[in-house]
Amino acid sequence: GASGLIAFPRV
């Protein structure tokens, strides 16, 4: 989760 950016899954 990066500030609610879908481009960033919880990796």
Curated annotation (Swiss-Prot):
Classification via Pfam families: Periviscerokin
Q: Where in the cell is it found?
A: Secreted
Alphabetical GO biological process terms: neuropeptide signaling pathway
Which domain of life does the protein's organism represent? Answer: Eukaryota
List the keywords (alphabetical).
Amidation, Neuropeptide, Secreted
Which residues does this entry mark as bearing Valine amide? Answer: V11
Per the record, its GO cellular-component terms are: extracellular region
* Family the UniProt entry places it in: Belongs to the periviscerokinin family.
Tell me, what does this protein do in biology? Answer: Mediates visceral muscle contractile activity (myotropic activity).
- Protein name, entry field: Periviscerokinin-2
From what organism does this protein derive? Chroicoptera sp. (strain Windhoek) (Praying mantis)
